[in-house]
Amino acid sequence: MADEIDAMALYRAWQQLDNGSCAQIRRVSEPDELRDIPAFYRLVQPFGWENPRHQQALLRMVFCLSAGKNVIRHQDKKSEQTTGISLGRALANSGRINERRIFQLIRADRTADMVQLRRLLTHAEPVLDWPLMARMLTWWGKRERQQLLEDFVLTTNKNA
């Protein structure tokens, strides 16, 4: 397996997952609980779960996808765009999320941040560039959180 997780293949695998496995995965309330679900391992095994460097990223990605089958909708980057739609832009474009909730998300501690993010995803049902979001989730540190806030605020101000 290459050094990077194939985010689109993971997205498609999630979309094609049977309803029973989806339901098992959706029931978890935080990312580490996925480790107790056999269907989770069947889903992530082809994406390099054995590589310890991929495990946290895969936990975060699947936890976000587990908000629902059609909650996160992928849209390819258009030819006139330099980048696809980021998570921050998508949340702002939804018109359902306010700045205070984004601020709370970026200030939250580990685990709580993913729980809050999944709630935001469920509420906003964003249309975004999934590989771009997956890359953000791979690292999910201070810089990625700041980028989320920056994209959200700049998009909100542009739409106002």
From Swiss-Prot:
<dbReference type="GO" id="GO:0051607">
    <property type="term" value="P:defense response to virus"/>
</dbReference>
<keyword id="KW-0694">RNA-binding</keyword>
<dbReference type="GO" id="GO:0032991">
    <property type="term" value="C:protein-containing complex"/>
</dbReference>
<dbReference type="GO" id="GO:0003676">
    <property type="term" value="F:nucleic acid binding"/>
</dbReference>
<dbReference type="GO" id="GO:0099048">
    <property type="term" value="P:CRISPR-cas system"/>
</dbReference>
<keyword id="KW-0051">Antiviral defense</keyword>
<comment type="similarity">
    <text>Belongs to the CRISPR-associated CasB/Cse2 family.</text>
</comment>
<comment type="subunit">
    <text>Homodimer. Part of the Cascade ribonucleoprotein complex, with stoichiometry CasA(1),CasB(2), CasC(6),CasD(1),CasE(1)-crRNA(1). The CasB homodimer forms a cleft that cradles the 3' end of the crRNA. Interacts directly with crRNA, CasA, CasC and CasE. Stable subcomplexes of CasBCDE-crRNA and CasCDE-crRNA also form, both of which are able to bind target dsDNA. Binding of target ssRNA or dsDNA causes a conformational change in the Cascade complex.</text>
</comment>
<comment type="function">
    <text>CRISPR (clustered regularly interspaced short palindromic repeat), is an adaptive immune system that provides protection against mobile genetic elements (viruses, transposable elements and conjugative plasmids). CRISPR clusters contain sequences complementary to antecedent mobile elements and target invading nucleic acids. CRISPR clusters are transcribed and processed into CRISPR RNA (crRNA).</text>
</comment>
<protein>
    <recommendedName>
        <fullName>CRISPR system Cascade subunit CasB</fullName>
    </recommendedName>
</protein>
<dbReference type="GO" id="GO:0003723">
    <property type="term" value="F:RNA binding"/>
</dbReference>
<dbReference type="InterPro" id="IPR038287">
    <property type="entry name" value="Cse2_sf"/>
</dbReference>
<dbReference type="GO" id="GO:0003677">
    <property type="term" value="F:DNA binding"/>
</dbReference>
<dbReference type="InterPro" id="IPR013382">
    <property type="entry name" value="CRISPR-assoc_prot_Cse2"/>
</dbReference>
<comment type="function">
    <text>A component of Cascade, which participates in CRISPR interference, the third stage of CRISPR immunity. Cascade binds both crRNA and in a sequence-specific manner negatively supercoiled dsDNA target. This leads to the formation of an R-loop in which the crRNA binds the target DNA, displacing the noncomplementary strand. Cas3 is recruited to Cascade, nicks target DNA and then unwinds and cleaves the target, leading to DNA degradation and invader neutralization.</text>
</comment>
<dbReference type="Pfam" id="PF09485">
    <property type="entry name" value="CRISPR_Cse2"/>
</dbReference>
